[in-house]
């Protein structure tokens, strides 16, 4: 069966809304507050698998989970001036308690650098207590004024993993940035999500950071989505809160910090990146259900009962071997109707069991990504399912990476860059001298967003000149249409 991706690529926004609704992943647009949605049971399980994975990776590197209050006093938020300027217009403020006006406005947490640094002034006094590595998985709130989109641009980001670390020296914090990058690389690799890493330009780094490294991916409509960030904060926040620690030589100094975050966007990408016109295709790493069994009724009622019993036995074997499996016993739907809904949901494997399979002591297994099937004897069931799931995982990952690579272009002509971006090129790289003035000019001329310069594996531009000033290029600047 030939699988098409026309809706997926050419009308992605509609496709995405259709999938999250019909697959019962996320209910968006009906809750009576703009920019806030509801995780439905199936979607919540997908979300939980991602949360469990990031917890495992952070815990393995010595991070400790905490849980801070939702409300942040205004004076705390304003303590680091550059930080609050970066998103003051996006803050939700609580101004009343019951009928009483509050003396100090309270912000619904937009991020937690200020709150955590404030508490660390009580917790940390000596280098012997360092490094500190905290993280929490919470809701954060931003008053988005642009058009909101489910999971992608929200006013309540309900799956915000933020890590915050404290270090004696700049170099220690620098090493932590590299560790955070490796954690995220492992996270995205495990989920099969392709990415590029860029150092954000000075004018677009995190407010209060020395520098920001961002992970971006390309969505089916060729727009770029930021899926993770890592910030070296230096001493900006520790100085603002007068947080000093005793160093090894007995002197007092301000420690250095990092922070790094990911959000619901990871789930949006996982649902989208390998989809087709039949629905989403979930990696076995995230799929709450690894296999769905569809019993095919026989003409004879007694034989149909035997098919159901046989299906239950097959499910029991798989579940007992750690492969989460369900049987669709809905008698109101035809097998074809069942195929339709489980394909939308992206369940990796479909197991069809009818009279033929019953008589031959076998099952017929179809992969969701290809809809190609094979007949498997019952005694080989577990080994074949394990093999198919692993092959499917690898194939999905390879396909996603191939899609991303096909969407990265290079040109040394600014007008050509604009044309490429207008024709859904994805990411376009141009030679750049690294000056802010030229970078802003490139952004203005193309009407695109500057992602920054490559963090790793940069192109050789030693013989190129900046597309604006024509001075020798030092690196490339990445441009894209973004969300």
UniProtKB/Swiss-Prot annotation:
Question: What keywords are annotated for this sequence in UniProt?
Answer: Aminoacyl-tRNA synthetase, ATP-binding, Cytoplasm, Ligase, Nucleotide-binding, Protein biosynthesis
Q: Which Pfam families match?
A: HGTP_anticodon, ProRS-C_1, tRNA-synt_2b
Q: Which GO terms describe its molecular function?
A: ATP binding; proline-tRNA ligase activity
| Intrachain S-S bonds | none
Spell out the GO cellular component terms annotated for this protein, sorted alphabetically and separated by semicolons.
Answer: aminoacyl-tRNA synthetase multienzyme complex; cytoplasm
Where does this protein reside within or beyond the cell?
Cytoplasm
Q: An example of a Gene Ontology BP annotation on this entry?
A: prolyl-tRNA aminoacylation
In the UniProt record, does the keyword Plastid occur?
Answer: no
Give the E.C. number(s): 6.1.1.15
Catalysed reactions, semicolon-separated? tRNA(Pro) + L-proline + ATP = L-prolyl-tRNA(Pro) + AMP + diphosphate
InterPro entries referenced in this protein's UniProt entry, alphabetically: aa-tRNA-synt_IIb (IPR002314), aa-tRNA-synth_II (IPR006195), aa-tRNA-synth_II/BPL/LPL (IPR045864), Anticodon-bd (IPR004154), Anticodon-bd_dom_sf (IPR036621), Pro-tRNA-ligase_IIa (IPR002316), Pro-tRNA-ligase_IIa_arc-type (IPR004499), Pro-tRNA_ligase_II_C (IPR016061)
Query: Matching PANTHER family, A to Z?
Result: BIFUNCTIONAL GLUTAMATE_PROLINE--TRNA LIGASE (PTHR43382:SF2), PROLYL-TRNA SYNTHETASE (PTHR43382)
Task: Give the record's family classification.
Answer: Belongs to the class-II aminoacyl-tRNA synthetase family. ProS type 3 subfamily.
Extract the NCBIfam families matched here.
proS_fam_I (TIGR00408)
Instruction: Describe the protein's quaternary organization and the partners it interacts with.
Output: Homodimer.
According to its record, what is known about the domains? Answer: Consists of three domains: the N-terminal catalytic domain, the anticodon-binding domain and the C-terminal extension.
What is the stated purpose of this protein?
A: Catalyzes the attachment of proline to tRNA(Pro) in a two-step reaction: proline is first activated by ATP to form Pro-AMP and then transferred to the acceptor end of tRNA(Pro).
Family annotation (HAMAP family): Pro_tRNA_synth_type3
Protein known as = Proline--tRNA ligase
